[in-house]
Amino acid sequence: YNNWEVIYVIGDLFLKENYVLDGNFLYVRCEDSYLHLLKKLVLSIKYLNEIFIINKGILRCGDDLIINENNLIKFLDDRTTKYDYYGHNPYGKNYICSGNTRNELKKIKKDNFMINYYASHCDDFLNPQHNLKNVNISLYSMRPDIYGASGVIYYISNKACKTLILHMEKINYNILHYDSFTKSYPYTIEDCAVSFIMYFNGINFINSYLFYDSPLHDTIAKHTNKHK
């Protein structure tokens, strides 16, 4: 699409190499679990930057979307304005960083999203590719009380991508890392974690209705898994 590569990313914990690019499929040596989505995302960004010269950024898409190709092509056009961290959330609000942002990140809440997910996906604990043996999900439910782009589909610029890589390198890509600054576990839910990393590093979130599922706007995608 307009010289933008389309790459499908698959985690393979037992891959001998760090990554393998096979056509449009990028296999990354990491867990292929829901809990490890952030790790898979950032590692894939790191390796894609080794493989390709990325001029603008990355449009991160879930695997449960119906794409409107005409709207996608319009978005990818160089003349379309794109922000460093750009997507849509249910609140329909931007988040603009300020001198008080880091204090705001210290506000935390209990989020049972992953607990509820794994309550109905118990077989995942038995899958060696997921590397969840002896992981007690309930211990990692506290996270910063923030909003940002929903993980369905969002755009991150090269600046944002570099920020994600540098931040995750510092914690050795450990999504169960305890963050002493917020006294929480910010990295277990991918979209929440991306928001946290962006705001911690002073990158704003810009909301737009053009990404997905807006009845009043022509969007890039329809989220087919919305109600499951």
State the predicted function of each range.
Residues 65-196, 200:
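Conserved catalytic core of nucleotide-sugar-dependent glycosyltransferases
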Residues 1-4:
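Short, acidic, metal-binding catalytic loop of nucleotide-sugar glycosyltransferases
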Residues 7-56, 69:
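Active-site-proximal specificity loops/subdomain of glycosyltransferases
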Residues 9-12, 31, 62, 89, ...:
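Structured beta-strand/turn binding interfaces of compact recognition modules in eukaryotic regulators
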Residues 58, 62-66:
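The conserved acidic donor/metal-binding loop of glycosyltransferases
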Residues 202-228:
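PAPS-dependent sulfotransferase catalytic core
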Residues 14, 49-52, 80, 169-172, ...:
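Eukaryotic basic, amphipathic alpha-helical target segments in cytosolic regions
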Residues 6-8, 60, 85:
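Structural beta-sheet core signal
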